[in-house]
Each structure stands twice: as structure tokens, then as C-alpha cells.
Design a protein with these regions (language model features):
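Bacterial N-terminal signal peptides that target proteins for export
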Residues: 1-11
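Bacterial N-terminal signal peptides
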Residues: 10-19
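N-terminal signal peptide c-region/cleavage motif recognized by signal peptidases
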Residues: 21-23
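N-terminal small/polar-rich segments of proteins
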Residues: 25-96, 129-169
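Acidic Ser/Thr/Pro-rich low-complexity disordered segments
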Residues: 27-31, 109-114
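Predominantly extracellular/luminal cell-surface or secreted proteins
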Residues: 78-82, 102-106, 114-116
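Extended, solvent-exposed segments with strong compositional bias
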Residues: 110-133
């Protein structure tokens, strides 16, 4: 099992299945395939603590894999809790001040993206090993929500760092 860790920074201003899956798994374990991610930040922009509505934003995670044959590689994507240590409520920080937010797997903001523990779920999929550079990367959208009426916020830049773990077999 291989793991690739990338960082996704949050700023307040974050089929060619020619062989069986078992063959693909064996190739990845022996180092014949490699998967990568490209991320875009979830940037919330300006925030007014007096506003009643939520501030929403999106980012993305693109997954692509390369190797010796057009095998389908299953994978999962997990996110860390960030500085809050909790999936229930993540927090961006500006010194000792915080803003609550969270990251979701869906546009209805119902499923928290995490590592599969507690209230969180991972996202999974499969991508074809790209031998010739022709297979498109698989894109997953990250939905960020910053709740309104966080009256303790002070002006400044709030940020959090989320570790992304891509596990492929």
C-alpha cells in the first residue's frame, strides 16, 4: 500500500481495465505504478462575522496514476482534521482567534470529508494507469463552508493546513 501526502492550504481571503484488480494491486505493491494528486485551495475570501448566511467555496483534488499497463487502480482520499484536531468542527486560525469551518464531499454540505473515523468519510474511486499520457485525471470537488455569525472574529488572515492522504493499492 502506498501513501502520498500533499497539503491543501485553506485561506480565509482551502478504463482500460486489461487485467484483474489483483494484478493492479501486485504492480503497485512492487512499485511499478505511481499516483499523484494536484490540489486547488478552498479560498473563502472576505468574511463578515455579522452576516447570517454561510460563506461557501470549492477546491479540487485531481488524481492520476502512471505505470506500465492500462490497469484500474482503486484508491481512497482522506483529509486530516487540521489545527482543530476534530472533524466535527475544523478551525482556521489568526493568532489566538479562530473561525469554524468544514470540508465536505458533497455540494449539499452533509458529508464531512475526513479519514473515515467519527463523523467523517473518505472518498474513493479508481483511476486507470496512464501509460501514454492520454487518460484524464479523476477530479473530486472539495466543498468548504464557513458558518455565518461568528462574532468573535477579528480582522486578519485566517488559515489552516489540511493533510491529504492518497492511498492506492
Amino acid at each position: 500500500m502506498n501513501r502520498l501526502q500533499r497539503q491543501l492550504t485553506l485561506l480565509a481571503l482551502m478504463l482500460l481495465g486489461l487485467f484483474a484488480a489483483g494484478s493492479a494491486r501486485a504492480l503497485c505493491i512492487t512499485g511499478v505504478c505511481a499516483c499523484t494528486t494536484v490540489t486547488t485551495n478552498v479560498a473563502f475570501g472576505s468574511y463578515s462575522p455579522l452576516a447570517f448566511g454561510n460563506t461557501d467555496s470549492t477546491g479540487s483534488v485531481k488524481v492520476s496514476c502512471g505505470g506500465v499497463a492500462g490497469l484500474l487502480i482503486p484508491f481512497s482520499i482522506g483529509f486530516s482534521t487540521g489545527s482543530s484536531g476534530s472533524y466535527a468542527t475544523r478551525q482556521m486560525k489568526n493568532g489566538s482567534y479562530t473561525l469554524n469551518y468544514n470540508l465536505y464531499t458533497d455540494a449539499s454540505y452533509t458529508t464531512i470529508w475526513g479519514d473515515g473515523t467519527g463523523v467523517s468519510q473518505m472518498v474513493g474511486g479508481g483511476v486507470t494507469l496512464d501509460v501514454l499520457g492520454l487518460a484524464p485525471a479523476q477530479t473530486f470537488w472539495v466543498y468548504g463552508r464557513l458558518p455565518g455569525r461568528q462574532l468573535t472574529a477579528v480582522p486578519g488572515v485566517y488559515a489552516d493546513t489540511i493533510n491529504l492522504t492518497l492511498t492506492y493499492y
